[in-house]
């Protein structure tokens, strides 16, 4: 599905990002894994290479526009082009009522989850324009569609990612670049796995499928949207949510 494509993943050291990188490689892409967690990112790249794929790891601070430019330049230097990018890196931030958030707790989440995606998208677009286009998938959230108490910076950032995605699609569709967003619900990541059993059971009950999702289930959707099989699909938000938003 992605044979001979070059794909870049941010936040690829673990969880959903790692699953996306692995599925990209399984489908034939050469993968650039990026993260600020060097051991985890290198482990993801090693997993892909040991399985017969081709991957490299590059460190990335998503809040640095210069670092994004360095990573994309190195990707093009090593592989000749950039066909696919998945902007996945993000944090949940602190859980507080909106009135209790500080400028610092707000800015940290917005800088990583929204501005970091903008820095990535901007740099990725400019690389893709040189080779005739590509596909960008931004990882949003179910909270890019609805609210949730005590996490307003995250909700605001993810709504922003959905809006940014639509604008990129409108601006660059005629130039061969597609851009979509994927909104996971609660997924079996390290954060969720470490929650008490009663909390995880409650989270499971909020989904129509009555379970928490697997990272690979999100990754399969991302890989399909990244591929030429989704050639007429752009500017859209896709929930990988087990029916959470059907409530």
For each predicted feature, which ranges?
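The beta1-alpha1 cofactor-binding region of Rossmann-like NAD(H)/NADP(H)-dependent oxidoreductases
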Residues: 38-39, 59-70, 103, 216-217
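Short C-terminal tail/terminal secondary-structure segment
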Residues: 92-95, 146, 206, 223, ...
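Substrate-binding pocket helix/loop in short-chain dehydrogenase/reductase
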Residues: 96-98, 102-110, 192, 203
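Active-site helix of classical SDR
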Residues: 121, 157, 165
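Alpha-helical segment proximal to the catalytic Tyr-Lys
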Residues: 126, 170-174, 231
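Residue(s) in the substrate-gating loop at a strand-loop-helix junction
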Residues: 141
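A conserved structural motif in NAD(P)-dependent oxidoreductases
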Residues: 207-218, 229
